[in-house]
Curated annotation (Swiss-Prot):
Alphabetical list of CDD domains matching this protein: AAK_G5K_ProB, PUA_G5K
Keywords: Amino-acid biosynthesis, ATP-binding, Cytoplasm, Kinase, Nucleotide-binding, Proline biosynthesis, Transferase
Binding sites annotated in the UniProt record for substrate: 55, 142, 154
Organism expressing this protein natively: Geotalea daltonii (strain DSM 22248 / JCM 15807 / FRC-32)
Similarity field: Belongs to the glutamate 5-kinase family.
Pathway per the UniProt entry: Amino-acid biosynthesis; L-proline biosynthesis; L-glutamate 5-semialdehyde from L-glutamate: step 1/2
Classification lineage: Bacteria, Pseudomonadati, Thermodesulfobacteriota, Desulfuromonadia, Geobacterales
Protein name as it appears in the record: Glutamate 5-kinase
HAMAP family associated with the record: ProB (MF_00456)
């Protein structure tokens, strides 16, 4: 199965966690970066384009601040990132140069991908770099990011980048061998799972737990990333990045780590962007009838199905769509503002112009702009 998947891969996103290329005491692990660069160069030799999402800037910079552990405050984290990002890029630049490969740095915030024009511009930039034989190295712009525009962790960022660059595979390098039935660091009976056909609620529950002492992402964030790219029909392989040769085993189609198969029905790129990259500006609660036609029949949301509107947003905003009990089941781009939607909620589409004095259309959210989660 893996060999068949790898045959189709022409572009891969490789996410490297902090725990893979740094240590608690010594900052960056130069030997590990050297080994990974050599393995990624082998991908290039086999005709596979590589986009790298790398953590490690904060961990690389914290020693310069005299911190013995992961920064706990936002100013500390941003200062460590400002110091460490240049150290991280210099390490990659030196090791890839040994293989005749140039690298480029891209620092992103969520706003860069939530804005459709900036999303497309970022894609064009990365495509150009790849056409020139350059490996893009992407990280969150920790030096300026605030809670409202942060990705949360680089697992999430890697999933969004996989959609952005239209890769055929996401590889997540971590400091354990893959996905286990329990945390192998605390449970000696934990068993490695080589194949996950579908990410279920049970899978997500088994993934509970925190990250390493130098990173922010735990197993739960990695499962969430695999689920997101799976919605676009893209598989994920999670493997131990601290073990030399594992990346080459992945490329060869060897059963190493854990393979997460994609969902049966995949979202197109734009709907994936709506569902996972846009930051919702409000909430629209619908009645049970609207819930059924949206979730089961793929219809548009009409004003008659709207029960309540929460938040202030303009036309064209992304909103959460919820059942009467508050459970989110979909997201969509609105054709009306929150003020307009409040006025026409519960009314028939034919009444819109009489109520507002104008009319954009019959739907408050068109089915082409609506994604059931």
């Amino acid at each position: 199965m893996r060999k068949e998947i790898l045959k189709k891969v022409k572009r891969v996103v490789i996410k490297i966690g902090s725990g893979v290329i740094t240590s608690v005491d010594n900052g960056l692990d130069g030997d590990r970066i050297k080994g990974l660069a050599a393995e990624m160069a082998h991908f290039r030799q086999q005709g596979v384009e590589v986009v790298l999402v790398s953590s490690g800037a904060v961990a690389a910079g914290r020693l310069e601040l005299g911190l013995s552990d992961r920064p706990r405050t936002i100013p500390q984290k941003q200062a460590a990132a400002a110091i460490g990002q240049s150290k991280l890029m210099r390490a990659y630049e030196e090791e890839f140069a040994c293989h005749g490969i140039k690298v480029a740095q891209l620092l992103l915030t969520r706003d860069d991908l939530a804005s459709r024009p900036r999303f497309l511009n970022a894609r064009a930039t990365i495509d150009t770099l790849l056409e020139c034989g350059i490996i893009p190295i992407i990280n969150e712009n920790d030096t300026v990011v605030v809670e409202e525009i942060k990705f949360g962790d680089n697992d999430n960022l890697s999933a969004l980048v996989t959609n952005l660059v239209e890769a055929q595979l996401l590889v997540i390098l971590t400091d354990i061998d893959g996905f286990y039935t329990a945390d192998p660091r605390t449970n000696p009976e934990a068993r490695l799972i080589h194949l996950v056909r579908s990410i279920t609620k049970e899978t997500e529950r088994a993934a509970g737990g925190s990250g390493s002492s130098v990173g922010t992402g735990g197993m739960a964030t990695k499962i969430a990333a695999a689920k997101k790219v799976g919605k676009s029909g893209i598989p994920t392989i999670m493997v131990n990045g601290k073990k030399s040769g594992n990346l080459e085993l992945v490329l060869a189609g060897t059963e190493v780590g854990t393979l997460f198969l994609p969902a049966g029905v995949s979202l197109n790129r734009r709907k994936h962007w709506i569902a996972y990259t846009q930051r919702p500006a409000g909430r629209v609660v619908v009645d049970n009838g609207a819930f059924r036609v949206l979730s089961q029949h793929g219809r548009s949301l009409l004003p008659s199905g709207v029960v309540q509107v929460e938040g202030k947003f303009d036309r064209g905003a992304c909103v959460r769509i919820c059942t009467p009990d508050g459970t989110e089941f979909a997201r969509g781009i609105t054709d009306y503002s929150s003020r307009e939607m409040e006025l026409i909620a519960g009314h028939k589409s034919g009444d819109i112009e009489q109520i507002l004095g104008y009319r954009y259309g019959d739907d408050v959210i068109h089915r082409d702009n609506l994604v059931v989660l």
